[in-house]
């Protein structure tokens, strides 16, 4: 069910022929109620619009197992993290509004790929896509990007671009069993793709190496307590060798070049109790990332959370959620920043905010309410401890309201 309905039956007719359309508008609203760097400013809103189509080429052209997917997105708005929570010289590591990630953009080509599934268990996908739609995938049932989408794209985001940013590449998946698959992917690394003004950049002239990803995913239908779960283990290897893109974070940016970087993740989602049909009941999830300490300002992160589906009778899709995230700052990077800022000889950096804590912590409590299948409203509270990994900025209390429309 969508906000625009079935278009007098046209939508169903097109779907039966192999043509499906989808569209969403998501709005993240945040207000810094207390603490942070500059509280009590006006609320900010980050908005994402997306419209896409999925073509079943078997129905349209007789191509067995072939699907074509296209998605265009646009993001506009402002960020409470930037405007109120953070000291500009010690940015918050997470962001209160996931839909503000990568800033504003008039429009972007976020997906354009062809996928072929083989009877032998192989699945090949080629084209443009975001890394987080293929690897380290995670639901977005929270507004903070510390709990939304592939966490590798946040903590190693200099190299890893999630949707809405896309890049050329390919992914090969092999289903070893109905519950276990392995996949590898190779994607261009092109910093130009992330720029707000290059949402439709299709050339590779500014590419610098590639991202090589691998992942094993086990999704038992009867795991813990005979309930479904999903477990992911993966790695990232990047081959960029231009010092402006790949450099040692213990020195001034872009001065000591490196020729590789790596990272890894372990993620899970496991249903713990069942109180009805489908997903109803208590679910747990977690995401743990590890990063190259030579080239990455974040050394590791930990995320744990709980979601309860269908807490109230008659609302099986509603979700009560709570999650905690810890972002560990690379001590090599932190020591360099603090040494620079305590040296009077460094006129531009001297006396700027010190990163005097080793981590930032993000918490969110929310309730995702579905008054209709096409509408979600999400009141929420967020609390940020040591924003920017410093005690020189107060802990921040954020009140928010997210919404999503499906049309």
Segments from the language model and where they lie:
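Outer membrane beta-barrel transmembrane domains
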Residues: 201-202, 215-218, 234-262, 269, ...
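Short loop/turn motifs that connect adjacent beta-strands in outer-membrane beta-barrel proteins
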Residues: 4-21, 55-68, 120-121, 179, ...
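Outer-membrane beta-barrel "beta-signal"
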Residues: 322, 395-407
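Outer membrane beta-barrel
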Residues: 42, 46-191, 296-301, 311-338
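Residues that define the transmembrane beta-barrel architecture of outer-membrane proteins
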Residues: 3, 17, 31, 43-49, ...
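Residue-level signature of outer-membrane beta-barrel architecture
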Residues: 14, 27, 55-59, 116, ...
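Transmembrane beta-barrel strands of outer-membrane/channel proteins
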Residues: 23-29, 68-74, 124-128, 184-188, ...
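Signature for the C-terminal beta-barrel architecture of outer-membrane proteins
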Residues: 121, 153-293, 297, 308
